[in-house]
Amino acid sequence: MPQTHEMSLNGTQYLKYELKDLESRAHDAKTPSTNEFYDDVESHGTEELVEAKLSFLNRIAAGLSAETKGIEPITEDEKTDDSILNAASMWFSANMVLPAYAIGALGPMVFDLNFGQSVFVIIFFNLLGLVSVAFFSVFGAELGLRQMILSRYLVGNIAARIFSFINFIACIGWGIVNTVASSQVLNMVNPGHQCPLWAGCIVIIGATVIVTFFGYGVIHAYEKWAWVPNFAVFLVIIARLARSKKFVLGEWTSGPTTAGNVLSFGSTVYGFAAGWTTYAADYTVYMPRKTNKYKIFFSLVVGLATPLYFTMILGAAVAMAAIGDPAWKTYYDENSIGGLTFAVLVPNSVHGFGQFCCVLLSLSTIANNVPNMYTIALSVQATWEPLAKVPRVIWTLLGNAAALGIAIPACYYFSTFMNYFMDSIGYYLAIYIAIACSEHFIYRRSFSAYNVDDWDSWERLPIGIAGTAALIVGAFGVALGMCQTYWVGEISRLIGDYGGDIGFELGLSWAFIVYNIARPFELKYFGR
């Protein structure tokens, strides 16, 4: 096992690099980061004042050992995170959480699949989704580019900015959905003296702020151990489930309706596993270029697959038990997965200790929120150059504040709408993967084809005409293939009695076809 790199980005060495980076921005007018932060200072007095204030904020952040680096490429001198364990544990903790457990329960509860069918879907579609996360994590170490900056090479400059905006919406949306779910679990604990929903939101977001403010180093240090209490709670759930003797395998079914349900559940599982794709490189950019790429890839595969399989299969097992028990089913119908977990752990079970376990499980969402609220800042900066002038720490704080401001009313008025909205926005991942993989494997073929110095050059980066066309056409494919409560596409409704969700499949395939038709023309007439 590689030696663990203990918080190398948070001590004296990290602070030295941060201060050095800030000084170079202030004095070297030839660097890309200087152009970003100090453009037209001499001719614009107001801008000079704003830039000075932003520089001051960055210095405060650096003084607190917080990461001040934004979307600028990470230099080789700054690549000090040589721990493969850091890369793997990042996603291990982020997926050993309540939301992944909740996804698994959907197989029996929503899609009428038995335990065996649910497990098959969980194994197959998770594997399809997580491979892209592991693959693009390799790019972070090799090129030192954030995922949305890397996207300028992979999908084109214009399309990358569209994806950056969508990614920003996804980050804040999933942060809201996760926070609402956790606050609802906290609200069930200690009947008669419950934690108010708004207070639960403050607890979850507040803890997320503390971790994400300090950036890469503290995030990896937190995620390295955040899985431990969550895993312990899941073991307690397994023990209580076994003692209840309520688990059943269920009956095997077949036919078009079952096929449609398998596809729909598979779409949900795939979306959760692949959801980290547009974040991937952000969490390996400080790894040295010499790091073995196969070790990164396969450690990420294990770090992703293990918690996803474990939590989702457990969720499916608990759901199967609830199907045969009216009391547990009522808890689920009224309070979703949080209610079902409460039913397993508290009434006629371990009582006070069970409530304590519910609290721990609700706090597990912090580990899932942290990547959202860190990447949100980088996505905003990558959308438009003026936004990159605002320090990362400010965007992180603003993103968390926005999530809190929306999550509190969502708890009371529109939590269902938020879930529907996020189910819809997740389809962009398949389109992104189709375009990005096409560009790398068909047109670039090796890392040597990426000139990192071009990261902010409109003249040298791919324009993004092909990428934008593929995104638009892929979106039409998604609309025809998606199967949600509020929308069933014309093609998806042909599968079974309730439709089958093939939005990811159509979006990916249509985007792939259009991109590879348009990209050769873009290269021929524009040369990039």
Curated annotation (Swiss-Prot):
KW NAD (keyword) present: no
InterPro entries named in the record: NCS1 (IPR012681), Pur-cyt_permease (IPR001248), Pur-cyt_permease_Fcy2/21/22 (IPR026030)
Task: Tell me the CDD domains matching this sequence.
Answer: SLC-NCS1sbd_CobB-like (cd11484)
The main location class comes to membrane
Q: Which residues cross the membrane?
A: 91-111, 119-139, 162-182, 199-219, 222-242, 261-281, 296-316, 341-361, 394-414, 417-437, 461-481, 494-514
Origin, by domain of life? Eukaryota
Q: Which residues lie on this side of the membrane: Cytoplasmic?
A: 1-90, 140-161, 220-221, 282-295, 362-393, 438-460, 515-528
Pfam families this protein is in? Transp_cyt_pur
Please provide one cellular component term from the Gene Ontology annotations of this protein: plasma membrane
Q: Which GO terms describe its biological process?
A: cytosine transport; purine-containing compound transmembrane transport
The way it spans or sits in the membrane comes to:
Multi-pass membrane protein
Q: List the disulfide bonds.
A: none
Q: Which Gene3D superfamilies match?
A: Hydantoin permease
Residues with the modification Phosphoserine, per the entry, are 43
> Keywords, A to Z?
Membrane, Phosphoprotein, Transmembrane, Transmembrane helix, Transport
Summary of the function given for this chain in its UniProt record? Probable purine-cytosine permease.
Family, similarity comment:
Belongs to the purine-cytosine permease (2.A.39) family.
> In its UniProt entry, what is this protein called?
Purine-cytosine permease FCY21
Q: What is the species listed in this Swiss-Prot or TrEMBL entry?
A: Saccharomyces cerevisiae (strain ATCC 204508 / S288c)
According to the entry, what is the taxonomic lineage of the organism?
Eukaryota, Fungi, Dikarya, Ascomycota, Saccharomycotina
What's the name of its gene? FCY21
